[in-house]
Amino acid sequence: MKVTLLGASGGIGQPLSLLLKLHLPAESDLSLYDVAPVTPGVAKDISHIPTSVEVEGFGGDDPSEALKGADIVLICAGVARKPGMTRADLFNVNAGIIQNLVEKVAQVCPQACVCIITNPVNSIIPIAAEVLKKAGVYDKRKLFGITTLDTIRSEKFIVQAKNIEINRNDISVIGGHSGVTILPLLSQIPHVEFTEQELKDLTHRIQNAGTEVVEAKAGAGSATLSMAYAAMRFVVSMARALNGEVITECAYIEGDGKFARFFAQPVRLGKNGVEEILPLGTLSAFEQQALEAMLPTLQTDIDNGVKFVTGE
C-alpha cells in the first residue's frame, strides 16, 4: 500500500505526515511531496520513528516521482484560511494549484484513489473530477472530498453537550464542507434526544467551528491539527478498505445526483473505492428544512468548480 501526500510541508501537511507514519497499516509506503525544499528533511525526520511505514520525501516543482505507484493520493496543498476569509475566498488561489496536481495524478497514477482536503472542498472536488474526466481517467468511485473534520467536531460537541459516549459511525454529516452546507444528522444518533433549540445551536456550532478556530488563532492560522487528525482517520479507513475491510465513512463524492451532483453522505468503502452509497434515513423537520435551504449554495459552489475547468 502506497500513500502519497501532496502538500506535506505545510501547517496541515507536517502533522498529517507524522500521523500517517504512526497509523497507516503496517508495511505501507508513505511518499511526501511539497514545493518547499524542506520536504526531504520532513521525511527524514519522521523516518526515525520506529514504525514499519517507510517514508521518502520529494521537493521541487514536479510531484511525478512521489506519485509513482500510489494507491492513495492525499492532497492538502494550497493556502490556508485567514481571518475574514470564507472558504470561497480561497478559491482563486487553490483552484489552480489543485488543477495542476490532479493533472499530474492523471498522468502518473490514474488508478489511485484521490482524497482532497484543500478548501473550498465544495468547488475543488468538481475541479478534480473535470480534470480527470478531461484526461479520460475519471472513476467517480475513487474521488473523495474529506469532510471528516465535520464528523469529528460533531462527535466532540455532542459528547460535550450531552455527556454521553457515541460511536464514530453514529453520526452522519451530509451536504458539503462549508457553512450552511454542513448538516449533521443529530436526530439519528441513538439513545439521545435533542430539543429543537439544542439541534439548532449544535448544528450552528458545527457549521461555524472552523471560524471558531481561525478567530482563536488571532490571524496565525486555521484548523490544522484537528484537520490533520481528521484526514489521517479517513485515509487509514481508505487504506483498510483497499485491503479488503468493509468500512463506512462520510465523504463528499459524486453520487446518484439526488440532491446535487456532488454531495457529502455516508458510503461503504471497499477495494474499488465507493462500493455503496448508504441511505440517509429519516430526517427531522429541522434537518429536512436545512437540507433544502443549503442546496442552492452547494449548487453554486459546484458550478464554480466545473466552470473553472470547462469554461462553461
UniProtKB/Swiss-Prot annotation:
Q: What InterPro entries would the database entry show? A: L-lactate/malate_DH, Lactate/malate_DH_C, Lactate/malate_DH_N, Lactate_DH/Glyco_Ohase_4_C, Malate_DH_AS, Malate_DH_type1, Malate_DH_type1_bac, NAD(P)-bd_dom_sf
Q: Which UniProt keywords apply?
A: NAD, Oxidoreductase, Tricarboxylic acid cycle
**Which residues participate directly in catalysis?**
H177
Residues that bind substrate: R81, R87, N119, R153
EC number assigned by the record: 1.1.1.37
Which catalysed reactions does the entry list for this protein?
Answer: (S)-malate + NAD(+) = oxaloacetate + NADH + H(+)
Q: Report the SUPFAM superfamilies cross-referenced here.
A: LDH C-terminal domain-like, NAD(P)-binding Rossmann-fold domains
Quote the record's binding site residues for NAD(+).
Answer: G7, A8, S9, G10, G11, I12, G13, D34, N94, I117, T118, N119, M227
Query: Which GO BP terms apply?
Result: malate metabolic process; tricarboxylic acid cycle
Q: Which GO terms describe its cellular component?
A: cytoplasm
Which molecular-function annotation in GO is an example for this chain? L-malate dehydrogenase (NAD+) activity
The record's function comment reads: Catalyzes the reversible oxidation of malate to oxaloacetate.
Q: Which family does it belong to?
A: Belongs to the LDH/MDH superfamily. MDH type 1 family.
Subunit structure of this chain's protein: Homodimer.
Its recorded name reads Malate dehydrogenase
